[in-house]
């Protein structure tokens, strides 16, 4: 019984610490969006030098309540239907211009097979073959990445790529892809990171 009590106390302390880390970068924490506790976690070696941008191919969200509901639904689908340990992306960006904690800065996500243990995956909520990413969404991601560098989660010379460059996918959708490929951190030729 004492062992179980210790494990619960440790889990609560860790959850509190992770909430503080998420809040540190103006991120809506998993606790704030009422997310589930991961079944298991593996830790990323930091700083991470690769950011993979994708989209969720779900409805677009514009309100806090709508985005939180979509993030909860994505997590439930990932954990129940796909048997992931947690929600796949490290972070999600809503149409309300807010960033939602997924697996976060510290944990290995489940967003890009073969790259999860060495990258942060950021998913824009919506289908960006049809939806247009707003300036607020793009700035929310830029702000998150700046904070990640400042806090030592991301390497100062990190590179950003699209999900479609690494696996057979249309993700992050052509409209979002056309925006992010203009960024100075953009890596056009991914040969150097494939199967590294």
Swiss-Prot record:
Family: Belongs to the N-acetylmuramoyl-L-alanine amidase 2 family.
Organism phylogeny: Eukaryota, Metazoa, Ecdysozoa, Arthropoda, Hexapoda
Described function: Binds specifically to peptidoglycan and triggers the propenoloxidase cascade which is an important insect defense mechanism.
Upregulating conditions: By bacterial challenge.
Signal sequence region: 1-23
S-S bonds: 25-147, 61-67
Protein name per the record: Peptidoglycan recognition protein
InterPro entries named in the record: Amidase/PGRP_sf, Amidase_domain, Peptidoglycan_recognition, PGRP, PGRP_domain_met/bac
């Amino acid at each position: 019984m004492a062992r179980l009590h210790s494990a619960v106390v440790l889990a609560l302390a860790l959850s509190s610490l992770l909430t503080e880390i998420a809040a540190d970068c103006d991120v809506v924490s998993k606790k704030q969006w009422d997310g589930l506790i991961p079944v298991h976690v593996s830790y990323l070696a930091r700083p991470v030098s690769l950011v993979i941008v994708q989209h969720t191919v779900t409805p677009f969200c514009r309100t806090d309540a709508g985005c939180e509901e979509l993030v909860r639904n994505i997590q439930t689908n990932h954990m129940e239907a796909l048997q992931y340990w947690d929600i796949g992306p490290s972070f999600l960006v809503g149409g309300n211009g807010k960033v939602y904690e997924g697996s976060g800065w510290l944990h290995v996500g489940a967003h890009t097979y073969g790259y999860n243990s060495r990258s942060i995956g950021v998913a824009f909520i919506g289908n960006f073959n049809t939806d247009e990413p707003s300036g607020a969404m793009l700035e929310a991601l830029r702000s998150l990445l700046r904070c990640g560098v400042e806090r030592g989660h991301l390497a100062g010379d990190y590179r950003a790529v699209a999900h479609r460059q690494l696996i057979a996918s249309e993700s992050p959708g052509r409209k979002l892809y056309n925006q992010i490929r203009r960024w100075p951190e953009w890596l056009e030729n991914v040969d150097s990171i494939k199967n590294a």
